[in-house]
Amino acid sequence: MNIFDEIGDKESVFKDKKYLDHRFLPDRLPHREEQIRSIAKYWVEALNGVTPPDITIYGKTGTGKTAVAKFAMKQLKEASKDCDVNIRTEYIRCTDYTTEYQVIARLCQQLGRDVPYRGWTKAEIVNTFRNMFKKNAFGQDMILMVVLDEIDILLRNDGDGLLYTLTRTDNVSILSISNYVEFKKFIKPRVRSSLRDREIVFPPYGAQQLVDILEERSKMSFKEGALDDDVIPLCAALAAKEEGDARYALDLLRTAGEIADERDSDKVLGDFVREAKDYIEHNKITDIILTLPSQQQRVLEAILYLTKRKEEITSGRLYEVYKEIAKGDSVSYRRIFDFINELEMLGLISTNTVSRGRGKGRTNIIDLQCETSLLEDSLWGV
């Protein structure tokens, strides 16, 4: 028997796993109706031929930002079929397109212009893009709603040139998405003043809200009776502790189901959820560390060294050890503070400011937030 047929014929707790993928866009987004309506009240202006204001949405990972933006795009596209306005919506993930040139080239291609991803000057690509917003053959102005997901990554990598170009192009409205509430510090005042964006905050999901989301998805994903009663509440409770991360909750539920299949169990048990948690945490931290820039990996290496020596880790002591590890290829002391903030934002370390007493000032104490063995495995593969 063919091995793929044999595996495919095995009994499974799943009906269809795709509904547990965070990229799946359902017909309803529980507990995000208010945020959808907030976007819609601005974007509705496009249906009347008016370019909507720019929007920025903030929130931690897994709070529904991308799903809500795509849901609003889908709804606007459907509504625009019945009006005499040329509305286009385009989604750009800034982890895939990390420079102004790449984003503008991608937009040109999506809008019907065959332009190269390299080889043209910046002026050529920008002019080609802007010329698309002149009257078309039918005498209609095109209004473009462009969603820039994880925009902080592009801003750190390439500066604010993209926002400068887009805010100075007629009939373009920007919806920026960021996990990082302070990403605007990467935007120069002249660009920030022309952005004039409306801000929408996405709060973390609560445990009961996560239960509601998981129950809807599980009905489409699992066979009837395949989930033990405590599975969904446990997934929701664990995800609520992870700052209300719905993506994490879905990963837990899917991975627990996969463990059930591996064990030839006809039921997903709470113990499988706990195993899934350990598996996901290990892989998540490893993936984060492996994708860090080399200088940040060296900072982590220095923190690991000091942690294993049970030393108190101050920023000054950290910089001393980091310079020894970097061996002449080190960054400035000020830059280390940026790295510390970014590593804390990723959940790999924590910082605590303590007072040294009268006249001695205050000091940042740094603590590692993952197991030393896991960090060693990730950094050195031992």
Curated annotation (Swiss-Prot):
Signal peptide: none
Record remark: domains: The N-terminal AAA+ ATPase domain and the C-terminal winged-helix (WH) domain are both required for DNA binding.
Organism whose genome encodes this protein: Methanothermobacter thermautotrophicus (strain ATCC 29096 / DSM 1053 / JCM 10044 / NBRC 100330 / Delta H)
GO terms under biological process: DNA replication
Family, similarity comment: Belongs to the CDC6/cdc18 family.
Sequence positions that bind ATP: T63, G64, K65, T66, A67, Y205, R217
Entry-linked SUPFAM superfamilies: P-loop containing nucleoside triphosphate hydrolases (SSF52540), Winged helix' DNA-binding domain (SSF46785)
Alphabetical keyword list: ATP-binding, DNA replication, DNA-binding, Nucleotide-binding
Modification comment: Autophosphorylated on a serine. Phosphorylation is stimulated by binding to MCM. Both single-stranded DNA and double-stranded DNA inhibit the phosphorylation reaction.
Pfam families: AAA_22 (PF13401), Cdc6_C (PF09079), Cdc6_lid (PF22703)
Function: Involved in regulation of DNA replication. May play an essential role in origin recognition. Binds to DNA, with a preference for origin-specific double-stranded sequences. Does not bind single-stranded DNA. Inhibits MCM helicase activity but does not affect its oligomeric state.
InterPro entries named in the record: AAA+_ATPase, AAA_22, Cdc6_C, Cdc6_lid, ORC1/CDC6, Orc1/Cdc6_arc, P-loop_NTPase, WH-like_DNA-bd_sf
Record text on subunit structure and interactions: Monomer. Interacts with MCM via the WH domain.
Segments traversing the membrane: none
PANTHER family named among the record's database cross-references: CELL DIVISION CONTROL PROTEIN 6 HOMOLOG (PTHR10763:SF26), CELL DIVISION CONTROL PROTEIN 6-RELATED (PTHR10763)
Name this protein carries in UniProt: ORC1-type DNA replication protein 1
Domain of life: Archaea
A Gene Ontology molecular function term of the record: ATP binding
